[in-house]
């Protein structure tokens, strides 16, 4: 279900106050005792969007203006990975790619040390599960880039690694239907070894329909499910495509259902070739060979969503954009 517009406009100086008011309303009124419904959407369903707005205004202490009739801001999404000058003269922020956001204790200590030594002791996290070190003087940049940690947390990762997002998955979440983090990293490494990819492609893995990794706003979103193949229950995914964020944002649509994870790679290869300009490397052979791999993948008469009758699958390739 898509988010419901609050029909509100605030000046940028009031954004933090508004967010705080929304959080306090949820803290005080939200169904947090029921873990199945401990999300903001359930409170909005209970109150209705108009009453929710009233509650937020009361907490904020003033009436909210109505939203602008249309989005007039031209905005391009940035991932903040790399080195960027700040508006403060002589300072930079450095964005590190943390593959699928997986940090160990030693990594955290290392990041804290690096922030202290080269920056102002501050770290920021992004929605793509990456880390930003702000306030790095020009004079310290070169030394920071020599830190061993940056061999794993790169400032210039490969295109698919750069944009990869994954939820916690079944290893640490009882709601997840599939393992996500390790599988997604392994899959991306194989895809990058077999394809030349001209630009980042946002691939988001989420373990269940709760969509913590936001697959509906990704170029390619993978939502965990259970499938049947040859009479066995396997981990699989439904595939979403075409999601965008920023100006004229919209949710992606489900283009393929019930793909066993063990059969997923050739499907992703074909999607990347057809929709994102990827070119198979020489080691892959010609595209006809690739298509034969794909046909073997989708000829799965006994594969279906749990509870549904087995049927032959037809793969539909959607053009993103």
Locations of the language-model features?
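Peripheral terminal and linker regions in Fe-S/redox and tRNA-modifying enzymes
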Residues: 1-321
